Swiss-Prot record:
Pfam families noted in UniProt: Aconitase
Enzyme Commission number(s) from the entry: 4.2.1.33
Family assignment from sequence similarity: Belongs to the aconitase/IPM isomerase family. LeuC type 1 subfamily.
Pathway note: Amino-acid biosynthesis; L-leucine biosynthesis; L-leucine from 3-methyl-2-oxobutanoate: step 2/4
Organism the protein comes from: Synechococcus sp. (strain CC9605)
Any one GO molecular-function label of the UniProt entry: metal ion binding
Catalytic activity: (2R,3S)-3-isopropylmalate = (2S)-2-isopropylmalate
Binding residues annotated for [4Fe-4S] cluster, in chain numbering: C347, C407, C410
Stated name of the protein: 3-isopropylmalate dehydratase large subunit
Source species taxonomy: Bacteria, Bacillati, Cyanobacteriota, Cyanophyceae, Synechococcales
Length: 472
């Protein structure tokens, strides 16, 4: 294999043909589907009399539309029930495995594929969901695709793609106590912009990245798309291999030994050239919260909402829109902003380590009066593991609701929604206007631990004041 970046190597291994116009037909090693973007794709297959090309490389789950308070069938929402029923019929007809409610394997698509060992280094992964970049944490190249492309992958197990440039995001040092991978990626997006990664794959590297757990790396790669990058990835290493070993779909025995050797060879070579490199100092990254209506409008917890003259000219129109929508004026300290709803979950931060971090803050404390706070595990496996550790009891004792797995309040496709002008402290990935279900609802993105801190204080809070020795 020639030297190069992991992106180059994986691209070359999956290249089928060069297409007219300069794009490449790329083989897809793993296709993940769910109930929202697959129905029209299956209908198109039926209209053309086509079969699913590789059902054994296709895996389904239900996540976006499922209620989290009760998942008894039929769902109260007839549209949600029809969407799941349609997915069930399509999977049965085409021989696609479905990780359904009650199977012990259901959950958010970007949570279950890694925990089942489906996502592996060197793969190309596609899914009709923006945050498919999550799987890059394993040294895979993972793309979110639209419904028409879901159809194409079902029919041909390939995609027409244009090759990206590679930007290395080098993060040196170690993150301070109380600062998480969520803070890191919000910090990166703040400084590079929501369009800064357009045309790029982001390679996350450096000692701070190497020190992250796999679940933290998934958080990082999950939000690469929010910085404009089509995908983000971390080179596979011992952390990757230890996470995968023993999972249901991971290789075993001699096959495992061979796989690890091959996976190791895929990492970016020391002499590889990247198209761009940006360096960050991990020690300088604070707990970070968004104040506006894009993930790039972030602030360190000790900062204030910027004035127009502090911003680049290109950032000013969206800032003015954010001032009006969020009702936050220049000079307002982000710490102390009151919240109404606190949501812990999503494909960004709904994994076991996320719940542990939030529970550490909630333990022995109480949700502030008038605050609605709830925790939604990212999968049935996460819920089971958290309950085995007693995390559900910690949250309930503190006044949080403990819910069933699903996408929940990350987006407005299920009953979990903001009302009116409510402000949410959310561990999800997007703070767009109306994203959480109310046309005027407001979202502040932050880490799960920061959400828990906001819940117990009723306002945006520096979590470091609650986890330091003097606070205990």
């Amino acid at each position: 294999m020639s030297s190069g970046t992991l992106y180059d190597k994986v691209w070359d291994l999956h290249r089928v043909a060069e297409l007219p116009g300069g794009s490449t037909q790329l083989f897809v090693g793993l296709h993940l589907i769910h109930e929202v973007t697959s129905p029209q794709a299956f209908s198109a297959l039926k209209d053309k009399g086509l079969l699913v090309r590789c059902p054994e490389r296709t895996v389904a789950t239900v996540d976006h539309i499922v209620p989290t308070t009760s998942q008894q069938r039929p769902f109260a929402d007839p549209l949600a029930e029809e969407m799941l029923s349609t997915l069930e019929r399509n999977c049965q007809e085409y021989g696609i495995p479905l990780n359904n409610i009650g199977s012990g394997r259901q959950g958010i698509v970007h949570v279950i594929a890694p925990e089942l060992g489906l996502t592996q280094p060197g793969m190309t992964v596609a899914c009709g969901d923006s945050h498919t970049s999550t799987h890059g944490a394993f040294g895979a190249i993972a793309f979110g695709i639209g419904t028409s492309q879901v159809r194409d992958v079902l029919a041909s197990q390939s995609l027409a793609m244009n090759k990206l440039k590679v930007r290395r995001i080098q993060v040196n040092g170690l993150l301070p106590e109380g600062v998480s991978a969520k803070d890191l990626i919000l910090h990166v997006i703040r400084h590079l912009g929501v369009k800064g990664g357009v045309g790029y794959a982001y390679e996350f590297a450096g000692s701070a990245i190497e020190a992250l757990s796999m679940e933290e790396r998934m958080t990082l790669c999950n939000m690469a798309i929010e910085g404009g990058a089509r995908c983000g990835y971390v080179n596979p290493d011992q952390v990757t291999f230890e996470y995968l070993k023993g999972r249901p779909h991971a290789p075993e025995g001699d096959a495992w030994t061979r796989a690890v050797a091959w996976w190791s060879s895929l990492a970016t070579d020391a002499n590889a050239t990247v198209d761009d490199e940006v360096v960050f100092d991990a020690a300088a990254i604070p707990p970070t919260v968004t104040w506006g209506i894009t993930p790039g409008q972030g602030l360190g917890i000790d900062e204030t909402v910027p004035s127009l003259d502090q911003l680049d000219p290109g950032e000013r129109p969206i800032a003015e829109e954010a001032y009006r929508y969020m009702d936050l004026q220049p000079g307002t300290a982000i710490a102390g902003v009151p919240v109404d709803v606190c949501f812990i979950g999503s494909c960004t931060n709904g994994r076991l380590s996320d719940l542990r971090a939030a529970a550490d803050v909630a333990r022995g404390r109480q949700v502030a009066e008038g605050i609605k706070a709830f925790v939604v595990p990212g999968s049935e496996q996460v819920a089971k593991a958290a309950e085995a550790e007693g995390l559900d009891a910690v949250f309930r004792a503190a006044g949080f609701e403990w819910r069933e797995p699903g996408c929940s309040m990350c987006l407005a496709m299920n009953p979990d929604r903001l009302e009116g002008r409510q402000i949410s402290a959310s561990s999800s990935n997007r703070n767009f206007k109306g994203r959480q279900g109310s046309a005027s609802g407001r979202t502040l993105l932050m880490s799960p631990a920061m959400v828990a801190a906001a819940a117990v204080n009723g306002r945006v809070t520096d979590v470091r004041t609650l986890i330091s020795p003097s606070a205990s």
